[in-house]
């Protein structure tokens, strides 16, 4: 079990033996806590620079990104990069938002898409240095399931104001 009970957590990893869980919403409050999974147990490691939740995330246990999220409305634009031992704040999203989907393989490549209330279709591409706006989702949505790489991403479900079954790749 995680060392700290929380929801709306960022996560990265490519297997059930190597993962990272970070940030999240407590009851009450937020956390900057980061925990590393070794296939058997969670170990607390270096915290995020700022507590937040419900952001986009991607990567591995040793190279991850956490971008956007909350607190605040319409969310935050900050991006934090994990190098395997610590978090560093890097270039902000062009548009602050929460509830966005994320895809990417490490802390040098990512897509952040959708998010916010009302739901947005906006998509941004992280090139390792900054975010660039690219082709939007066909259906603006927030709080969707997401996965994949920058060249093969998937967004499924979420809410457009009501729950949706829309899937885009």
Q: Predicted regions span which residues?
A:
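Polar, enzyme-active/binding microenvironments
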Residues: 1-169
């Amino acid at each position: 079990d995680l060392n700290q009970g929380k929801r709306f957590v960022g996560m990265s990893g490519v297997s059930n033996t190597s993962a990272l869980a970070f940030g999240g919403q407590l009851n009450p409050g937020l956390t900057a806590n980061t925990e590393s999974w070794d296939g058997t147990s969670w170990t607390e490691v270096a915290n995020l620079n700022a507590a937040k939740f419900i952001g986009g995330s991607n990567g591995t246990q040793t190279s991850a990104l956490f971008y956007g999220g909350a607190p605040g409305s319409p969310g935050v634009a900050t991006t934090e990069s994990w190098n395997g031992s610590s978090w560093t704040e890097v270039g902000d999203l062009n548009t602050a938002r929460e509830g966005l989907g994320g895809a990417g393989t490490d802390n040098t490549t990512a897509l952040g898409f959708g998010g916010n209330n009302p739901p947005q279709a906006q998509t941004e591409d992280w090139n390792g240095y900054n975010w660039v706006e690219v082709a939007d989702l066909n259906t603006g949505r927030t709080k969707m399931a997401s996965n994949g790489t920058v060249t093969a991403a998937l967004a499924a479900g979420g809410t457009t104001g009501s729950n949706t079954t829309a899937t885009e790749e």
